[in-house]
């Protein structure tokens, strides 16, 4: 009789958040796609810039800083107007980072937003130093955009 060893599967951190919001899919898509405004309202985001942009794709860099730790990561985003934004890592402290946003209309004035992110840091040291900060930031994204929508669209 052989002794089977359990296979240890390395599970990448995953973050999934969903929210129903009283704003249109188009309004929420525009907020999420407005990368240059991120430092104004995203906790931990200290800078952002668009490196390249076409109607269906955008490459953007985001600077994240918290507790004295600063990192920049760049993603290439596939854009489907008012429906989805799919992100793929170009550069940053990750071995892997994929994810995105989906905007599903529920009515003219409401939609469901979904945010999903799979990521793995390049090494344990970076994960120890930056992991909690990044997970916290990513986990609060939907909330931050919901609050931002209220500020931007309720003022109209």
Residue ranges and their predicted role:
Residues 25, 51-56, 78-82, 102-112:
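A short, structured loop/turn motif at beta-sheet edges
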Residues 89-140:
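Beta-strand/loop substructures that line and gate deep hydrophobic ligand-binding cavities in soluble
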Residues 8-56, 155:
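Hydrophobic ligand-binding cavity/cleft-lining segments
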Residues 146-156:
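Short, highly charged C-terminal tails/helix-capping segments
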Residues 1-5:
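Short, small-residue-biased leader/transition segments that mark boundaries at the very start
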Residues 17-19, 49, 73-78, 98-105, ...:
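Hydrophobic/aromatic beta-strand elements that line small-molecule binding cavities or substrate pockets
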Residues 21-25, 64-68, 79-83, 93-95, ...:
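Beta-strand elements of well-folded, non-transmembrane domains
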Residues 49-91, 144, 148:
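Glycine-rich portal/gate segments that line the openings of hydrophobic small-molecule binding cavities
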């Amino acid at each position: 009789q052989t002794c089977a060893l359990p296979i240890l599967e390395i599970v990448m951190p995953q973050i999934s958040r969903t929210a129903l919001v009283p704003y249109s899919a188009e309004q929420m898509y525009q907020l999420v796609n407005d990368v240059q405004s991120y430092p104004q309202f995203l906790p931990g985001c200290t800078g952002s810039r668009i490196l390249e942009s076409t109607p269906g794709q955008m490459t953007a860099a985001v600077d994240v800083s918290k507790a004295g730790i600063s990192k920049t990561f760049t993603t290439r985003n596939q854009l489907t107007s008012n429906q989805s934004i799919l992100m793929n890592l170009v550069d940053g402290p990750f071995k892997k980072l994929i994810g995105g946003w989906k905007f599903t209309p529920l009515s003219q004035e409401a939609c469901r937003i979904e945010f999903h992110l799979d990521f793995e840091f390049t090494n344990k040291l970076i994960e120890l130093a930056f992991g909690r900060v990044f997970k916290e930031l990513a986990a609060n994204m939907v909330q931050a955009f919901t609050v931002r929508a209220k500020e931007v669209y309720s003022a109209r």
